[in-house]
Amino acid sequence: MVSKALLRLVSAVNRRRMKLLLGIALLAYVASVWGNFVNMRSIQENGELKIESKIEEMVEPLREKIRDLEKSFTQKYPPVKFLSEKDRKRILITGGAGFVGSHLTDKLMMDGHEVTVVDNFFTGRKRNVEHWIGHENFELINHDVVEPLYIEVDQIYHLASPASPPNYMYNPIKTLKTNTIGTLNMLGLAKRVGARLLLASTSEVYGDPEVHPQSEDYWGHVNPIGPRACYDEGKRVAETMCYAYMKQEGVEVRVARIFNTFGPRMHMNDGRVVSNFILQALQGEPLTVYGSGSQTRAFQYVSDLVNGLVALMNSNVSSPVNLGNPEEHTILEFAQLIKNLVGSGSEIQFLSEAQDDPQKRKPDIKKAKLMLGWEPVVPLEEGLNKAIHYFRKELEYQANNQYIPKPKPARIKKGRTRHS
């Protein structure tokens, strides 16, 4: 009886022990699983952190490139002033891809206007204005002004015309057509849309002047059949057309008689004295002076001219206005100055005097000062240094086998091209 009771007691104890052992084993198993889970989770988290870190390292350069792209998009165009609809004008510039025209384009675009450039690229270059292509205020049209143009504008700056001797002597008939038929078409456009037109005339209307300095009331001394007559007489006729349209049709006109101008974007081989001397000095070639070099010229920097054109367009002055720098230099002095600024060892070579080369050229700008509040402000040496820097870059551009359009040489049977 007692033995049976003991057996039952031992059996009960064993069952409890087994349950306890099983419980302990189960707890140990759960603890082990939980430990493994925690450990695996830690490894996973560390792995994820490493992966995230690796991805971050790979993505950061992409983010940097995106930031650079965004920055380049916001800085794609030069800063443009915001103008209200009332103040913003629709402006047409013929010859706007040329030397002066492209600088005028920059000025009017940065002032906040809508600018349409028309050019046949005879002497103009697309890369002079390519930094504006795509801007909502800018349009570039490949068009020759000898053909009519139909467009809605408020102002017309009529600059289209070959302006350097090799260009207009190469094609004198085209030069005459541009200055006559082209001007007629632009005046017709101005009449149709009620626009104001500014004609870019020239100091060449004074010819080889017998009056010095030249004021706007001087009629000039021009050879009507000389090698440069296609340009000189073309501009004189263009002025006559402007005032005929003003008197008969009521067209608002402005006439700027532009004197020698220089600066970046001049053609390297356009035959003008500034470009000739700079190019020759940079290449170590002799600086060619026609005659004794005692002829005088007055040179203005292109930004001064552009400011004068804008001031004249927006003024009430309808009679011709001289725009030039009255600071006069002989051609020989000018050659020596450029030699010194370039640091060139070039010699100065004297050639026989050119046909119809004006002996003196200096503007009287009293009218511009009084009626426009305008006069040149850029010192000659400062402007020349900028032009020299530009020509250095152009020569590098050419040396890298990049194509630079060059004007074709003038076909002249008698005489030579003269200092311009």
Curated annotation (Swiss-Prot):
Primary site of residence: Golgi
Residue ranges annotated as Lumenal topological domain: 41-420
Ubl conjugation among keywords: no
Enzyme Commission numbers on file: 4.1.1.35
Cofactors demanded by this protein: NAD(+)
Residue intervals on the Cytoplasmic side: 1-19
UniProt-annotated location(s): Golgi apparatus, Golgi stack membrane
Residue numbers carrying Phosphothreonine: T94
GO molecular function: identical protein binding; NAD+ binding; protein homodimerization activity; UDP-glucuronate decarboxylase activity
Residue(s) carrying N-acetylmethionine: M1
Catalytic activity: UDP-alpha-D-glucuronate + H(+) = UDP-alpha-D-xylose + CO2
First-tier enzyme category under EC: lyase
Membrane-topology annotation of the record: Single-pass type II membrane protein
Active site, renumbered: Y231
Alphabetic keyword roster: Acetylation, Decarboxylase, Glycoprotein, Golgi apparatus, Lyase, Membrane, NAD, Phosphoprotein, Signal-anchor, Transmembrane, Transmembrane helix
Gene Ontology biological process terms, A to Z: D-xylose metabolic process; UDP-D-xylose biosynthetic process
Binding site for UDP-alpha-D-glucuronate: L149, Y150, K177, N185, G188, K191, R192, Y245, Q248, E249
InterPro entries documented for this protein: NAD(P)-bd_dom, NAD(P)-bd_dom_sf, UXS-like, UXS1_N
Pathway: Nucleotide-sugar biosynthesis; UDP-alpha-D-xylose biosynthesis; UDP-alpha-D-xylose from UDP-alpha-D-glucuronate: step 1/1
Superkingdom field: Eukaryota
Family classification: Belongs to the NAD(P)-dependent epimerase/dehydratase family. UDP-glucuronic acid decarboxylase subfamily.
Subunit-level organization: Homodimer and homotetramer. Interacts with AKT1.
Record protein name field: UDP-glucuronic acid decarboxylase 1
Source organism (scientific name): Homo sapiens
Lineage: Eukaryota, Metazoa, Chordata, Craniata, Vertebrata
Gene symbol of the encoding locus: UXS1
